[in-house]
Amino acid sequence: MIFRQLFDATSGTYSYLIASRRGAEALIIDPVLEKVDRYLQLMAELDLRLVKAVDTHLHADHITGLGALRDRTHCITVMGEQSGVDVVSMRVADGDVIRIEGLGLNVMYTPGHTDDSYSFLLDDRVFTGDTLLIRGTGRTDFQNGDPRAQYDSIFNRLLRLPDDTLVYPAHDYKGDTVSTIGEERRFNPRLRVASVDEYVALMNGLNLSNPKMMDVAVPANMRQGLAQAEIARRGWAVTARDALDFPTRPDVTLIDLREAAERARHGKIPGALHVPYPELQESIGPGGVLHGLADATGRRLVFFCAFGERSAMAVQAARDAGLATAVHIHGGIGAWKEAGGPIVM
């Protein structure tokens, strides 16, 4: 496995680049905007292809690299289902698995620092975001933080992992790089409490000043810019309501870009072909299945995904590949359901 812990000294943020091997798909956790060039350089050196960029939560102390990485690599951007961030193209829930070639991150909902905080378990290590820090815990006094929820996330979720599980947080300000669950149980001063009420009192009494970047970072991270807006401006989008008859039209092929777990949870549009977004480029290129289908039948390719972000990028890629009539369903499966479109489970 390729594993790199990368540090932004300005914000004290750790980002994590992960892949199963050289030449494979990669994902990155908690990227920082100012470090995007470095991430891309490192991935080029390691012959990696970024397919997913993940944030553990809405950050208040730096601007995320999710939007820039999406624009420069066409990767899938991932956050928890509670997140309101507009750049997110895939939303996950507790118990899901974020998969790339050869690896899978097990998704754990660990609210408390914020209401959209997640941790991700990969074999012998857990990426805890700002929920559990090295000899500390994330503050709970803004962004719908809740010390009671954080206590539950730490004591009833994270601390139940094996003692030798490596802990990789999103931040450290003392120079520490990694800990273990066992170390934090024994030595973390904020975990030396006898009850949830004692923990709540401890966290409520911290009286911390707001992060220096908070007034800039939070709004910037909420609005990274939708790929859908530009695609709609070019006339390459259809509304879900206008697409309601597409499943029965002989001149249209619907293409579902979501992953299998998303389809199982949220349902499928009848008759749609399943081409997961990471496999799209091969399918639309010369000799690819979708390119051949469009050439042989003359059908219009209509892409859709969960929210419309992946499908917007797919339309651009398809048109770049010569599929000049490709469009996507603006707003994805969510908009389709709101419009009353048929769904099969």
Cite the ranges covered by each PLM segment.
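Active-site HxH/HxHxD metal-binding segment of metal-dependent hydrolases
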Residues: 12, 23-25, 33-109, 186-187
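Positively charged, proline/Ser/Thr-rich regional signature most characteristic
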Residues: 230-301
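Active-site neighborhood of phospho(di)ester-bond hydrolases with catalytic His/Asp-centered motifs
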Residues: 28-31, 49-59, 78-81, 110-112, ...
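Core dinuclear metal-dependent hydrolase active-site scaffold
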Residues: 5, 17, 97-122, 160
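Catalytic cysteine-centered active loop of the rhodanese-like fold, especially the PTP/DSP P-loop
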Residues: 108, 259, 275, 286-338, ...
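Accessory terminal helices/loops
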Residues: 152-166, 170-241
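Divalent metal-coordination and catalytic microenvironments
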Residues: 18, 30, 57, 69, ...
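Conserved beta-strand hairpin/beta-sheet module of binuclear metal-dependent hydrolase folds
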Residues: 1-49, 119-129, 135
